[in-house]
A protein has these predicted regions:
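Conserved AMP-binding A3 loop
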Residues: 71-76, 203-204, 211-235
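Conserved pre-ATP/AMP-binding loop-to-beta segment of ANL
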Residues: 58-60, 170-171, 177, 181-188, ...
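Structural core segment of the AMP-binding/adenylate-forming
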Residues: 3-12, 112-115, 119-191
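AMP-binding/adenylate-forming catalytic core of the ANL superfamily
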Residues: 134, 138-141, 148-153, 295, ...
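Conserved AMP-binding/adenylate-forming core of the ANL superfamily
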Residues: 58-115, 132-137, 188-191, 230-231
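Conserved AMP-binding/adenylation subdomain of ANL enzymes
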Residues: 234-251, 258-301, 315
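Gly/Ser/Thr-rich phosphate-binding loop
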Residues: 189-193, 273, 291, 299-304, ...
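Conserved ATP/PPi-binding loop(s) of AMP-dependent carboxylate-activating enzymes
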Residues: 383-387, 398-431, 467-469, 565
Length: 574
């Protein structure tokens, strides 16, 4: 491994975690922003214009490529283009605080639009391009969005005639527009941009003004709109500096779509607040395409999801040998826990540790992480970010001793915590059941050295014969078996044991489903973990249902298996 602690300690932005944790104060970070002097606040100004008005103006801020396009934009380019889009919105009459949604594939226009929306003081709502009509409707309806930016290809999935608040639709890549309706006026992005001035008076906002509305799916009910404010930039900036360890010369690639919170917090805000060169690759995942991208651009810092790393692992190590990946110096993973097996594989094929970290849509930014300058325990999510207090609490809100599984909670008050669940105060209050603590809904334990270990979602933990079993532990063990590409584990009602463990498994290439293999997998878990943790049922499937951000949807498998309603499926991959 080339990124040993000794090798990186001097070069890392945070050379000593323990010292940083002891001395850190969020107030000190405020000095990094221009509003600390001017009092004028706007995320887009800090992320783009601050650099465009400095020696970084000609630095490449965005490298964009897909099957058809290959483009680059400096900070100055993005300043002027987002100014133009801000003017487009202002001319149409869009005001501060209005919800403006984006429903389009990754493209320069998406990023320019998003920055222009923020410059206008409006609240941006990013949607996954793969959403179908019901998912689009739910989010536009709940948010009372007045404006949507989309493409001709995606427009058929927008029930715009049935959304009374939606008055403007801006189509990207389309000069010929559909007929306006009584309520909706169509605009061409290209036509309006040509008319718009490159000078723009930014709408200065309060740090507590709404900035972005990300919808997140629960196991029940409609998706919830999680509101974050401009003040979140304090956390985006500092976590990108210390966890992503972004440095001046870096080419940074976050593979997440902006429809998912990682794609905004760490695909847009974190890197650009730090003045980094950000790479966006359009199109679908393929190991060859991804490795080619790293090689072509000389990517230094790479952030992706466990599913992607497991897929890369499943195609075998030989593929990596065909590409020059030596530019990589720091790899990170987020979205769901990273199995220890994948960390060891990363050390073998990339000679680098893959750094897992933990946060969620509601926290707005990274909360617990593995840091370049800190010893790693593969399979652990790491230690709390400086300025963050995390704890494992029981049902009554008492802190549990090391090694005991309980509720993962975070002391309220960090800069990027959610400020509201849109139109649902009762749901917002449920996140803070114990005075002063945010309850994540995840179960975890903390070991004697202060490292946190994920055990499962509160509603995923299995009670079998009086024992509590975290599904992630069993899944991680299964993935260690050479035949297994991916695994998901659920609890199934059982009259004798309360619940039994059922595993769903997708095999690697070259393996086929047999009774012998199923028994071998059961024994593999029994011998590797414990008898009570061994699955009593194993179902081998071609694929496992996942969200578009790569999380395996255990609740969907459980619903299919037990014949129950599946709940909201809008975030599920095709």
């Amino acid at each position: 491994v080339t990124d040993t602690i000794a090798a990186v300690k001097e070069k890392a932005n945070m050379p000593d975690y323990e010292q940083a944790y002891k001395e850190f104060n969020w107030k000190d970070v405020e000095k990094s922003f221009s509003w600390h002097e001017t009092g004028k606040v706007n995320m887009a100004h800090e992320a783009i214009d601050r650099h465009a008005n400095s020696w970084r103006k000609n630095k490449v801020a965005l490298y964009y490529s897909d099957q058809q396009r290959d483009e680059k934009y400096t900070f100055r380019d993005l300043k002027l283009l987002s100014n133009q889009f801000g003017n487009v919105l202002r001319t149409i009459g869009i005001e501060k605080g209005e919800r403006v949604f984006l429903f389009m594939p990754r493209s320069p226009e998406l990023y320019i639009s998003l920055l222009g929306i923020l410059k206008n003081g409006s609240i941006v709502g990013p949607l996954f391009e793969a959403f179908m009509e019901q998912a689009v409707r739910d989010r536009l309806e709940n948010s009372d969005a007045t404006t949507l930016i989309t493409t001709k290809e995606l427009l058929p999935r927008v029930p715009y005639k049935e959304l009374p608040h939606l008055n403007q639709i801006i189509l990207v890549g389309e000069e010929e527009l559909p007929d306006n309706t009584e309520d909706v006026t169509f605009y061409s992005y290209e036509t309006e941009m040509k008319k718009a001035s490159r000078d723009f008076e930014i709408e200065w906002v309060d740090r507590e003004d709404g900035m972005i509305l990300h919808y997140t799916s629960g196991s029940t009910g409609k998706p919830k709109g999680i509101l974050h404010v401009h003040n979140a930039m304090i956390q985006h900036y500092q976590t990108a500096k210390w966890v992503l360890d972004l440095q001046e010369e870096d080419i940074y690639w976050c593979t997440a779509d902006p429809g998912w919170v990682t794609g905004t917090s760490y695909g847009i805000f974190g890197p650009w607040l730090n003045g980094a060169s950000n790479l966006i690759r359009g199109g679908r995942f393929s190991p060859e395409d991804w490795y080619k991208t790293i090689e072509k651009y000389g990517v230094n810092v790479w952030l992706s999801a466990p599913t992607a790393f497991r897929r890369l692992m499943a195609v075998g190590d030989n593929v990596t040998k065909e590409y020059d990946l030596r530019s990589l110096r720091h790899i990170l993973s987020v979205g769901e826990p990273l199995n220890a097996e994948v960390v060891h594989w990363g050390m073998k094929v990339y000679q680098l540790r893959i750094h897992d970290h933990w946060w969620m849509t509601e926290t707005g930014g990274i909360i617990i992480a593995n840091y370049r300058s800190m010893e790693m325990k593969p399979g652990s999510m790491g230690k709390p970010f400086p300025g963050i207090e995390a704890a494992i609490l029981d049902e009554q809100g008492n802190e549990l001793p090391p090694g005991k599984m309980g509720k993962l909670c975070v002391k309220a008050g960090w800069p990027s915590v959610l400020r509201a669940v849109w139109k649902n105060e009762a749901r917002f209050n449920q996140y803070f059941p114990v005075d002063g603590w945010f309850e994540s809904g995840d179960l975890a334990l903390k070991d004697k050295d202060g490292y946190f270990w994920f055990e499962g979602r509160d509603d995923d933990v299995i009670q079998t014969s009086g024992e509590r079993v975290g599904p992630f532990e069993v899944e991680s063990k299964l993935v260690e078996h050479p035949a297994v590409a991916e695994a998901a584990v659920i609890g199934k009602p059982d009259p004798e044991r309360g619940e039994i463990i059922k595993a769903f498994v997708a095999l690697r290439d070259g393996y086929t489903k047999t009774d012998e293999l199923q028994e071998e997998l059961r024994l593999f878990v029994k011998q590797g973990l414990a008898a009570h943790a061994a699955p009593r049922e194993i179902e081998i499937r071609e694929f496992l249902p996942k969200t578009r951000s790569g999380k395996i949807m255990r609740r969907v498998l459980k619903a299919w298996d037990l014949g129950l309603p599946t709940g909201d499926l809008s975030t599920m991959e095709e």
